């Protein structure tokens, strides 16, 4: 396994200083993707402000197959919004004042997307120290500090592999959302589409440290080549920050995706510690890994790794939530019965008053039962116990026990005539858990945002954002002042009690 350390190209990097703290730093909030918020959310009383996240959304009939990057939040309540500006490429970040949405600054990027089906998310990150990184062309990271200051700046520029990077602007692509560790080191996947530096090979993982020094390792398997690091799979870090987790595609084709692997790497050296095939627990065949999804590893408080895959053969289109020990050497429990395009959120068991099991934490997942995929169309959300099990009614498999489930509320006109009781899909790829109110905030394709009260197992608040649309799944987050942020139909909505 090759590993490279290079002196990276840096523009104005040494002069940058980190002076702001971070409330929401990236995909699913933190490097473990827990999606837990310590900030109490405001009531879902009104849409306080809204802003487009796509200036040229490309619809497929009545559907929108575009993933949007998560907003980021500073402690000073600056909301940093990734925005798609063109039909197929073109990206910028806009910083807005959380109180009223007023524009503070705009930073553009020359980034272009890797080859894709559904449009991938554009994933920036804030370090815990408040430094902002976002992807640029040729594998470049663009950098700025003082993110709460109402001024556009000339960003710093960091390249992880070579000084003459502009030669490879068109071919070297950052292919995952960025992830920051507790010290401010940045991790991401890359791929090379065309001529590029030989050392990079065709796909791998890169790290840029706080001094701008780059490390990268091409990913390979002894049993065969790796096709690419999985698009949209934000790298995750163990609780002690020493192990990095990411998934990658093998070359065996399955439907619209491929077989895949989950890697554990030393976070400092990027040495591969272990790599395991991702298998369908029912058939024993390679599970499908799809670049149209955004599933990323979630790290439990005990170090377990949870990762969602699609089923093979495709019996349900729900997939599975696989679980692994921290070193990936074993599976400490049964899978969850849903894994497609979902990053599980961590729920402290104390938030669920009706729970009397032994687990210290539970998992919140989307739990759709797709009518178009052989299910009954009764789409739900679920709280699951990773240490207990029950028989899955559809597959006969033993799966994580359902602690709570809740059915969506809006009938689905596409399916309700053939599937009585069918409701619109839940439209989340990561849902924020509000620790202060014992609730989960989740989007639905009916265009509404729901507060799921875990004490009463009911929807205690609902607010309509749009008329509803079929779309690629989106995140929910909570800002520094408690406003809830949700994306629906290419628009970011800030919801709260009012200004």
Question: What are the functions of these language-model segments?
Answer:
Residues 4-15:
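Bacterial N-terminal signal peptides
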Residues 23-27, 31-65, 75-81, 86-119, ...:
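Extracytoplasmic/lumenal domain signature
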Residues 1-2, 483:
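Intrinsically disordered, low-complexity serine/proline/glycine/threonine-rich regulatory regions
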Residues 18-20:
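Boundary at the C-terminal end of the N-terminal hydrophobic targeting segment
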């Amino acid at each position: 396994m090759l590993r490279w350390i290079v002196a990276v190209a840096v523009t104005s990097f040494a002069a940058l200083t980190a002076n702001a703290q971070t409330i929401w730093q990236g995909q699913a909030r933190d490097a473990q993707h827990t999606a837990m918020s310590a900030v109490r959310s405001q009531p879902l009383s009104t849409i306080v402000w809204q802003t487009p996240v796509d200036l040229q959304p490309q619809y497929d009939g009545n559907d929108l197959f575009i993933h949007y990057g998560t907003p980021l939040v500073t402690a000073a309540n600056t909301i940093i919004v990734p925005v798609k500006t063109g039909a197929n490429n073109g990206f910028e970040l806009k910083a807005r004042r959380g109180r009223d949405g007023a524009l503070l600054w705009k930073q553009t990027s020359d980034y272009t997307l890797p080859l894709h089906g559904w449009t991938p998310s554009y994933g920036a990150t804030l370090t815990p120290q408040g430094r902002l990184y976002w992807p640029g062309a040729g594998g470049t990271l663009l950098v700025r500090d003082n993110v709460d200051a109402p001024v556009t700046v000339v960003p710093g520029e960091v390249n992880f592999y070579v000084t003459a990077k502009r030669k490879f602007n068109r071919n070297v692509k950052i292919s995952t959302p960025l992830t920051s560790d507790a010290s401010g080191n940045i991790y991401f996947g890359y791929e090379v589409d065309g001529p590029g530096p030989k050392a990079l090979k065709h796909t791998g993982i890169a790290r840029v440290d706080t001094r701008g020094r780059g490390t990268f390792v091409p990913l390979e398997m002894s049993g065969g080549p790796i096709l690419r690091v999985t698009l949209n799979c934000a790298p995750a870090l163990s609780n002690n920050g020493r192990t990095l987790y990411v998934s990658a595609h093998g070359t065996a084709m399955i439907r619209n995706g491929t077989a895949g692997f989950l890697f554990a790497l030393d976070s400092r050296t990027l040495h591969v510690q272990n790599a395991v095939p991702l298998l369908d627990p029912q058939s024993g065949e390679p599970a499908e890994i799809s670049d149209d999804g955004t599933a990323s590893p979630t790290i439990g408080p005990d170090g377990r790794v949870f990762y969602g895959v699609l089923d093979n053969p495709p019996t349900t289109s729900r997939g599975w939530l696989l679980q692994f020990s921290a070193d990936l050497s074993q599976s400490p429990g049964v899978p969850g019965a849903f894994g497609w395009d979902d990053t599980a959120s961590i729920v402290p068991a104390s938030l669920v008053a009706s729970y009397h099991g032994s687990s210290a934490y539970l998992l919140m997942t989307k739990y759709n039962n797709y009518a178009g995929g052989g299910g009954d169309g009764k789409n739900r959300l679920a709280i699951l116990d990773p240490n207990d099990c029950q028989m899955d009614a559809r597959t006969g498999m033993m799966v994580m026990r359902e602690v709570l489930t809740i059915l969506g509320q809006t009938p689905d006109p596409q399916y309700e005539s053939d599937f009585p009781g069918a409701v619109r899909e839940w439209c989340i790829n990561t849902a924020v858990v509000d620790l202060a109110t014992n609730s989960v905030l989740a989007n639905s394709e009916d265009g509404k945002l729901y507060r799921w009260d875990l004490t009463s197992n009911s929807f205690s608040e609902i607010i309509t954002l749009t008329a509803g649309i079929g779309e690629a799944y989106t995140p929910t987050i909570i800002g520094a002042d408690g406003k809830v942020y949700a994306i629906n139909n290419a628009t970011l909505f800030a919801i709260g009690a009012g200004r």
